[in-house]
Amino acid sequence: MKNINVYYIIKSKISLKRVTAVRKYDITALGEILIDFVPDGVDSVGDMRFIRKAGGAPLNVLATAARAGLKTAFIGKVGNDLPGEFLIETVKGCGIDCNYLKKDNEHNTTLAFVELDNKGDRKFSFYRTYGADRFIYESDVDKKLIADSKVFHFGSLSLTDEPSYFSTEIAVKTAKDCGCTVTYDPNYRPPLWDSPEKAAERMAVLLPYVDIIKLSVEELEMISEGRGTEFLFEKGVRLALVTDGDKGATLCFKGEKAHIPAIKAKTVDTTGAGDIFLGTFVSEFIKKGENLDELSLDDAINFTQKAVFISGKSTEKYGAIASISDVII
């Protein structure tokens, strides 16, 4: 691949022209939805306080797209409990269709506690052994909804266990058969896997059905066993976005590589930044009204530039959904 040096450019005008499409939904996503308990200082006796935030990578991607004016839908599960009610109301508030987000009477809503270091980087502790998002069955996957969507998105947390693993596989294959653009974010979370080896194996299984992938430098190293993006393209991926924290991101497309440096941000919390990055890129791709065959390298670079900017700005606020900048509109 050739390397192209690209510098961040803010365009004064970005076309928001919508293209009339036969399909009802712009993006449908399947996967985890959970409560993130994020630090909120300490109380009067010095104990750490936490506040609840809606979380889950697929949800963050959809929230970003919905903020950009796109029509979105979410396939997933929450418990029939107070955290689940909070998440449903949050999804509705984001403008995401939640008719396919189901309540599970047998399992609780998944919870995660987040710790932030002085750079805003995170550590997670999950309460998910009986989390509802692990119990997505094939019957929960609405194939007509997927067929009525331009883009289908999924992540790797629904691949950790059955029955969600099988259901995700069914959904992805349905999307591919229906001509959806399939997007994927491996989003590796070590506490949720038995071993890095099992994670790498499972996260690579559905690559032949993926059109666009977003992953970190570390995730790429793990999945490809050091072979890099060539491994992804050999599997059938067509466009790769490789993020590298405060170093920026690299677009790999049509035999070329373009690196976009990160913006200078006053980072306090990186939660959801990668999801917002991908949500921005995919939103721009959809609004352009092209498919990957027609997408030019220049347009892909422009989308990546905007994604780097929006995701960088999001790290200046706490929480994922709350930090999605109005700039995306």
Where are these regions (language model features)?
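Active-site metal-binding loops of divalent metal-dependent hydrolases
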Residues: 33, 157, 186, 276
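Conserved beta-alpha-beta core of the PfkB/ribokinase-like small-molecule kinase fold
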Residues: 159-231, 247-248
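Short, conserved phosphate/pyrophosphate- and ester-handling motifs at nucleotide-, phospho-/glycolipid
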Residues: 65, 216, 274
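Conserved phosphate-binding/catalytic region of the ribokinase-like
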Residues: 2-10, 15-26, 173, 226-329
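Conserved N-terminal subdomain of the carbohydrate kinase-like
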Residues: 71-154
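Glycine-rich phosphate/adenosyl-contacting loop at the front of the ribokinase-like
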Residues: 7-97
